[in-house]
Amino acid sequence: MRGYHGDRGSHPRPARFADQQHMDVGPAARAPYLLGSREAFSTEPRFCAPRAGLGHLSPEGPLSLSEGPSSVGPEGGPGGVGAGGSSSTFPRMYPGQGPFDTCEDCVGHPQGKGATRLLPTFLDQFEKQLPVQQDGFHTLPYQRGPAGPGPGPGSGAAPEARSESPSRIRHLVHSVQKLFAKSHSLEAPGKRDYNGPKAEGRSSSGGDSYSGPGSGGPPTSHHHHHHHHHHHHQSRHGKRSKSKDRKGDGRHQTKATGWWSSDDNLDSDSGFLGGRPPGEPGGPFCLDAPDGSYRDLSFKGRSGGSEGRCLACTGMSMSLDGQSVKRSAWHTMMVSQGRDGYPGAGPGKGLLGPETKAKARTYHYLQVPQDDWGGYPTGGKDGEIPCRRMRSGSYIKAMGDEESGDSDGSPKTSPKALARRFASRRSSSVDTARINCCVPPRIHPRSSIPGYSRSLTTGQLSEEFNQQLEAVCGSVFGELESQAVDALDLPGCFRMRSHSYLRAIQAGCSQDDDCLPLLAAPASVSGRPGSSFNFRKAPPPIPPGSQAPPRISITAQSSTDSAHESFTAAEGPARRCSSADGLDGPTMGARTLELAPVPPRASPKPPTLIIKTIPGREELRSLARQRKWRPSIGVQVETISDSDTENRSRREFHSIGVQVEEDKRRARFKRSNSVTAGVQADLELEGLAGLATVATEDKALQFGRPFQRQASEPQPGPRAPTYSVFRTVHTQGQWAYREGYPLPYEPPATDGSPGPPPVPAPGPGSGRRDSWMERGSRSLPDSGRTSPCPRDGEWFIKMLRAEVEKLEHWCQQMEREAEDYELPEEILEKIRSAVGSTQLLLSQKVQQFFRLCQQSLDPTAFPVPTFQDLAGFWDLLQLSIEDVTLKFLELQQLKANSWKLLEPKEEKKVPPPIPKKPSRGRGVPVKERSLDSVDRQRQEARKRLLAAKRAASFRHSSATESADSIEIYIPEAQTRL
C-alpha cells in the first residue's frame, strides 16, 4: 500500500549499504516512496488509486504495491525524508507524533527529483544499529502465506524485500512489544526516550512524508512535521505507525507475501486512518491499497471522530475517563476480544485479511493492568510488556503459561505478600473512607489483584487462581487465625469460567488497591445501625484495622459451585456475632449484641450485598445477614470470622460460588452440585417479629421457616437482639424458602421456628415462636456435614424436627386440655381427630421424609435424593401439616372461646336457607346433613384456598427464581468485566 517500487523488494540491500541509502537520491536509486506526513490528505478516506504507469518513477520498474497514495494527496510533496523524520516502527509515546506514523514501508516512491530517497535497507541497517531493548517476549513471525501480487509488476518482490529482513521483523516485534510496554506499563518516561530518538532516526529512514513521486514538496518539512506528530501522538499511533511500517514492508506486503508477526494484528493493523484531516492526530494516512484486494478488504472510513483508531489506542486514552493509559486503564478493555479492539470495520481492521481478522478475534487480548504500575519490579523488566495483547495463539499461550506460572511472581506482588500487606494494613488503620466501598474499582491501582484480570484460558485461570488462592489462603489464614484454616476447606480447583472469575475479581478485587478481594475485609460499615448499605458494585470495603481477621469467602461463582452456604453452628447464646474477632474482645456495651464498639467491618458484601444493619447490630451487618443474593462474588472476605467459632452461632455464607469460611466452626461448604440449583441466599436481618411473620408466609416457598439457628447472633444474655437471619434461599428453579437462623431453639437442636405452618394458636403458635427465639440459643449439633449436600438434607431434617416438635406440642396440649376439662363430645372428637391426624402424619409421611433426608445425607445411599426431591416432598408434607394445623387452629379458637363450639352459630346461620328448600318435617335431618356438608365444604374450601395460595406462591417464586437465576448466570454469560 505504501508506494513500493517494484524493484524495492527485488533486491533488498544489506545494512552495510545503509550509507548508500542516504546517498541514493537519484531516480535510479530505489528511493522509498515516502508519504509526506503533512501531505494535505483529503479528510475523507482516500483510496489512492494506484498510479498507472509510474515507470518513470523508478528506472527499475513501475511501482508495484505502492501506487498512488501520495499522488492523491492534495499536496503531494516529495515525501523526502528529512533526517529527523520519525519512523513509525518505533512505538512512539510522544504526543507530538504525527497523524500518520508513516511506515518505513512508505518509502517506496522516488519523491520528486529533489526528494531524498532512503533505501529500504537503510531501515534494516538502522534497526540493526538501534539498540533493541529486549522485551523478554519473543514472538516468532510466522509467514502469512503469499498474498495476491499487487497491481504493480514488482509487487511480489517488494514484499519479499521486507520479509527477507529478519532484523526488520525482529525490530518490528520488539517495537510492538515496547509499544505495549510503554503504553500499558507506562514505565518511567525515561524508558520511552528511545522511542523519541530512535523514532527520529528511523523516521529519517522511515519515510515520514507521504508524497507521490510526482509531488514535489520539501521532503524534510513533511518529515519534520510528521515527526512532531509522531511525538505528539505516539501514544496513540505509535502502534499504528509501527504496524504501518510493518504494513508497508511486512504487513501490507504481507498481504502479498509478508510475514505476520504475532503482533501484526495490533491496532495499527489497518494502516488506514480514514476520515481525518491530515493535520489531525488521527489524520488519515492513506496508504495506497497495494492491490484491489486490499482496497476491497476493508478500508471503510470510520464515521466517527475517533474513526480509524484502534480501541487499543483510543481505548486506553478513553478508558480512564480520558486519562491516557494511566494505571489500570486497560482493565476497561479487559477481556475485549480482538474484534472489540477495533470498533467496527474501520481502519483498525482495514488491511487484515478476513482470516487474519478471525484469527485476531479468536484470542482475547491478554491485558494486564499494571496494578500500581509500579507494582512491577522495574529492574530487569525494561522490555517486558505487561499488556499481553500480542495475538498470535502461541504467543498468547506462552504468555498465558508464563503468567499463570508467575502469577505469584514479580509482576504482581505475590498473593502471600499481598495477604501480609493486607493483614498489616488491616491492623494499621485501613482507610475507613474505603468503607464506603463505593470507590470505582478503576480508581485503585489494583496492584493486589491476583489475576490482573488476565483473560487466560479457563484452565490457566483455574491454575492461576488456585495458586493464588492457595498462596493467599496460606498467608491469610496463617496470619488470620489458624482455626480459620481448619474450617477452610478449599476445593482443589475452583471451576470457574474465566469471565465470571474475571468479573468477580474485577468487581471484588480490583476495587481496592490491596483489598485483595480475597482479603478485602468487609469495611466496617460504620456502625450506623439502621443504615442499609448497598454495596452493590462496590469493592468489598476494607475493614478498619481493628476488625477481626476477615473471613475469606471466595465465591468464584463457578456455575457448578452455585451456592455454597457455610453454616457454622455457634453455641453460646451470648456470643456476639462479632463480625470481626476484634469485636469479640470489646463488648459493644450499647449494642444488645455485645458488638464491639469497634465498627464491625460489615463483611464485605459481595458487590451486590445490601447490608441492613439493625441498629445495635453492627455485627449483624458483619454477619452479612441481609446479604441480598450475591451473584458471583469473586473472592470475598467475611470478616465475620469469629474466633469463637463454636460460640458464633452458625454463620452462613451463601455465595454463588466457592466460599471459604475462615471459621473453624463447621464452616462447611455447602455446595449444591447441580449448576442450576445454585441456591441464592438472602440473608436478611430481621427482628423476631419479622421472623414470625415471615415464617408463615408462602409455606411452600419458605420451607425453612425461620430456621432460627441463633445464627452467630451473639445474643447477649438478654438475647435482646432477637433478630433472626432469614435466608431466603432461591433455589434457582423453584422454591424460595426462608431460613431464619438466629432462632435459638429449644433442646432439640433442630428447633427451627414453627416455620411453614401458620401459627395455629396465637398463644402456642406465636408465643411459641417467641419462646423459641428467646429460649437459649443452642447450636445444632454437628450433624454429619460430610454429605455432598449436607445443607439440603440437614436443613430439611432441622425443619422437620421443628415441625414435629410443634405438632407434638400441640397434641400434648390438646390432650391435656381434654383431660383437664370436661369438654363436649364434639370438641373431644375434634381433639381426637386433630391428634390422630397428627400422629398418623408423624408416623408416616414425616418418617418417610425424615428417611429421605437421612438418605440425602448418606453418601453411600444409592438413590441420593436431590435437593429438589426433598423440597418437593417437603412441599407435599406441608400440605398435610397445613391440614393438621387447621385443626389445631380451630381447637385454639375453641379454647379461646372457653371451649364453646363456634359451630352452633354457624349452624344457626346456615340452616335457615336449607329449611326453605326441603319440607320442615325433614328440616332437622337436613340441618344435620347440611352441617356435615358445611363442615366438609369449609374444609374443602380451605384446601382449595391453600392449594391456590401454594400454586400462586410457587408461580411467584418460580418467576422470581427465574429472574434470580438469570441474574446469577449473567456474569457467566458476559465476556467483559
Curated annotation (Swiss-Prot):
Q: Which residue ranges are recorded for the region named Disordered? A: 1-30, 52-90, 137-167, 181-289, 398-417, 529-582, 739-788, 906-939
A Pfam family assignment: GKAP
Write out the GO cellular component annotations: cholinergic synapse; dendritic spine; glutamatergic synapse; neuromuscular junction; neuronal cell body; plasma membrane; postsynaptic density; postsynaptic specialization
Q: Which tissues express it?
A: Expressed in most brain regions.
Q: Where in the cell is it found?
A: Cell membrane; Postsynaptic density; Synapse
Single GO MF annotation: protein domain specific binding
Positions with biased composition (Basic and acidic residues)? 1-10, 189-201, 767-777, 925-939
**Segments of skewed composition (Pro residues):** 538-547, 754-763
Keyword annotations of the record: Cell membrane, Membrane, Phosphoprotein, Synapse
**Entry-linked InterPro entries:** SAPAP (IPR005026)
- Please list the residue ranges that the record marks as compositionally biased, kind Gly residues: 74-85
Phosphoserine occurs at 58, 404, 407, 410, 414, 641, 643, 930, 933, 965
According to UniProt, the name of this protein is Disks large-associated protein 3
Q: Which gene encodes it?
A: Dlgap3
